[in-house]
Amino acid sequence: MAAMKRLVLVGAGHAHAQVLLEWRRRPAPGVELVVVSPVGLAPYSGMVPGWLAGAYRHDEIVIDFPRLCAAAGAHWVDAELDSLDAQRQCVHLSTGAPLEYDLLSLNVGSTLRPPPAAGARVLAMRPLALLPPAYGEVLSAWTSEPGARPWRLTGVGGGPAGVESMLAVMARLRRLRPDRPVHGTLVSDSAQLLPGLSPAARRAASRALAAAGVSLRLGSAWSAQVGEHSDLVLWATGAQAHDWQRDPARRGGLAVQAGGFIRIDEHLRSVSHPQVFASGDCAHWEPAAGGLPKAGVVAVRMGPVLADNLRRAIAGRAPASYRPQPRFLVLLATGDGRAIASRGAFGAEGAWAWRWKNRIDRRFIRRYAVAAERGPAVSRAPTTSLHEGDSA
């Protein structure tokens, strides 16, 4: 009888959610599936701006990974990856326990390292799981502070996250305390707002920011002086790799590019260790000269290919190739019941775009809620409880 294989998924990312969804429908016999993450309720990135603006409750935008694991027959381990030994095929967890694997998939997202800003609260847009408590403190301070002293908000980052977070937070604060003025400034070291989007979408974003009372400072680097004059700094600069990815001693020989992102081939597989897969923000897709955008839509589209290739690897079959879209639809919420649509040279705005975005996002998140509610799609033999440190 063949030995049980262990597939370990580290991270509660969008791609891993799809692996679990597929596993629930069609589990692989003879495989123990383990999911490791300190985040049980993982926010769907596409709905975060709407949640910031108050359009959604927090429970409406999260994927419940422990319940999804239960439905897929997977073991859930509430821990964080501390280090990796790719040669010995073992991950070391924040609990101090080692966890061996036959196959490993990393979908751990990215992070940000905001600088200290004297006199200002700093709200970092990554990692998403840390946003709810931090944002709750911001809203509490805004609503409970006596008087009507104006607040000055500074957004750092001229990409989609920077634009959406600024518009969303401004709208939320004004709705909560219409008696208090709030002023915004968006700072970006890029000479252009939303580089990569269509000219029409960039113009629409500029109009939305102006209508919200947000001034633009393009081609300007962040400085501590800016933070000193702000009540709140929204930090939405480019994604950064986690500390363990940037530390040679902790990544255990796994090949990374200069920024620490895991180098993967067209099959979403590590270029240095074929038994390791990576997807989403934590990965650098080698076939593209500059990699792929750090955007949720990329991880979502990698999900089905990742699920297929993990199954192929288990069976010893050749992997499939991931083919990124040359152009993909971007829908940016503007916090006022409207949105901006951009794809290639196309760009438009309106309430219809928000309704479109809302339908897409709710349909996406509903799939995981339904799967978690219904439980396993097929009957399966009961599994024994996992003890970290067990041999695979």
Give the positions of each predicted feature:
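Beta1-alpha1 glycine-rich phosphate/pyrophosphate-binding loop at the start
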Residues: 2-75, 154-155, 160-196
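A Rossmann-like FAD-binding core segment of flavoenzymes
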Residues: 76-83, 171-266
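Short glycine-enriched, charge-decorated loop/helix-capping segments at active-site entrances
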Residues: 48-56, 119-124, 201, 250-251, ...
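FAD-site-proximal beta/loop scaffold in flavoenzymes
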Residues: 120-147, 227-301
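A conserved FAD-binding loop/helix module that cradles the flavin
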Residues: 264, 282-334
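C-terminal auxiliary extensions adjacent to catalytic cores
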Residues: 336-392
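Short glycine-rich anion-binding loops that position phosphate/pyrophosphate groups of nucleotides
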Residues: 15, 109-112, 239-241, 337
